[in-house]
Amino acid sequence: MNNLKNLRGTVDLFPDQLIKWQNVEKILLEQLSRASIKEIRTPILEMTELFIRGIGEGTDVVSKEMYTFLDRGERSCTLRPEGTASVARALIQNGISSNPIQKLWYMGPMFRYERPQAGRQRQFHQLGVEFIGHDSVRSDVEIIALAWDILRKLGIKELNLEINTLGDTNDRSNFQKSFLKWLETNKDSLDLDSQNRISKNPLRILDSKNIQTKKVLENAPRLFNFLSEKSHNRYLDLKRQLEVLKIPYVENFNLVRGLDYYTHTAFEITSGALGSQATVCGGGRYDDLIKQMGGPNTPAIGFAIGLERLILLAGKELEIPRNTDIYIINKGLVAESLAMDLSRKLRNYDLLVELDLSGASFSKQFKKANKLKSKSIIVIGEDEAVNGEFIIRLFDQSGNGNEEEVISFENDIKLENWINNNLLVK
C-alpha cells in the first residue's frame, strides 16, 4: 500500500494550486458567455472507431498516443485524446439537422500517451470552442479573435499568431501528388520519422521539428501554389479582416496541425514566454469532418487551448486566494449548534464563511482567523449562546480587532446592515 502512486503523466492538484485554475476557468467562462457560446458535454470514453475515422488512422494521435482497451463486452474503447470528434459524433447522433448552426464550448480532461514535461501531461485539460454550420471567412476571423482576446485577458505575454491555408480537398490532392514525388526524390535527406510518414501522413512532414528536415523542406513544393482561385481569395479575405481588427499575424506555410480533418484555415497562437512548448492555442476549419463521419454536409471551425500551459503563463495575480469574509469562532455545545446555523445563513449573502470546527480554545481560534487574514470574525461563546446573540467585528491588517457589535440571532435586519456596510461596500 505504501508504494501506491499516481500514474506517470498524471498530476494531483491541491487547493493552493487550484486557486489559479479556478480563477483562469472563471475568466474563460465569462468570456465565452459574453460571446453567446453554449456549453456541450460529451463522454470521456468513446468507441475507438470514432477517432480512427474522425482524426485519421495515419496521425500520431491515433497510431501512437491513444489510450485504447477492450471492455468486458470486447468493444474497443478509447479515452478521448481531443474533443472535436466527440462533439461531431454527439451532433450527428442527436440530429444536427434540427439545429445546424451552433456555437459550442467544452472543457475537461483529455488523454494522450506522450512524454511528460512542463505544460504537457498524459492526462491534460483542454478548452475547446466549435462554431458549427458557419462557413464564412467572418466565422474564421471571429474564432481567431476570440482565442486572441481570451489569451490577452489572462495576461499572457509575447503572443504570436501563425496562420496558413490548407485549401479544400481538391487543392490538397493536387499538392500531395507533387509533394509525394518530391519526397521520394529527397527521401534520404529526411530524418527517419519523416521517412516513415511518407506512406502514412505525408502532410505532417511539413510540420517537422527536425532541423535537418526543416532545411530540406525549404525547397519543397508549397501547398499555397496549388490553391484554386476560390481558396486563394478566401485566404486573402482572412488576412484582410485580421488586419482590419489589428490582430498581428505571421504566415507559416508549413503549419498543417496534427489532425487529418482540417481544411482551409489553420492557425496557432504561441507565446515566447513558454520556450520549446510554445503553442498555447491551435485550431482551424474542418468542413468535411461531419459529413465524413456520416452526418450532413456541415461546415465548421474550432480551436482548443491547453489549460496546463495556460496556467503556466497566466498572470501571478490569479494565484492570489480570496480572503475569508467571516471566520466564526465558537465554543460550547449550544454555541456550536448556533454557529452552524448562522454559517448557513451567512453564506446566502455570497460571503466566504469559515466555521471553526476544532473545539479549540478561543485564543487558538483567533490565531487561525488571523492566519487566514479573515476580514471579520464572529464570536459565539457560552454567554452569547445563553443571551441569544453573537459578537461581530472587523479585523484590521495586523489582525487586531476593531469596534465590535452585538447582534441578536433573530435580528436579521441588523446583521444585513452590518454586512452591507462593512463587507459588501464597494
UniProtKB/Swiss-Prot annotation:
Pfam families: HGTP_anticodon (PF03129), tRNA-synt_His (PF13393). Signal peptide: none annotated. It is an enzyme of class 6 (ligase). InterPro entries: aa-tRNA-synth_II (IPR006195), aa-tRNA-synth_II/BPL/LPL (IPR045864), Anticodon-bd (IPR004154), Anticodon-bd_dom_sf (IPR036621), His-tRNA-ligase (IPR015807), HisRS-like_core (IPR041715), HisRS/HisZ (IPR004516). Its main location: cytoplasm. SUPFAM superfamilies: Class II aaRS ABD-related, Class II aaRS and biotin synthetases. GO terms for biological process: histidyl-tRNA aminoacylation. Keywords: Aminoacyl-tRNA synthetase, ATP-binding, Cytoplasm, Ligase, Nucleotide-binding, Protein biosynthesis. Its EC number is 6.1.1.21. One of its GO terms (molecular function) is ATP binding. It catalyses: tRNA(His) + L-histidine + ATP = L-histidyl-tRNA(His) + AMP + diphosphate + H(+). GO terms for cellular component: cytoplasm. It is found in: Cytoplasm. NCBIfam families: hisS. Belongs to the class-II aminoacyl-tRNA synthetase family. Homodimer. This is Histidine--tRNA ligase. It comes from Prochlorococcus marinus (strain AS9601). The lineage of its organism: Bacteria, Bacillati, Cyanobacteriota, Cyanophyceae, Synechococcales. The gene is hisS.
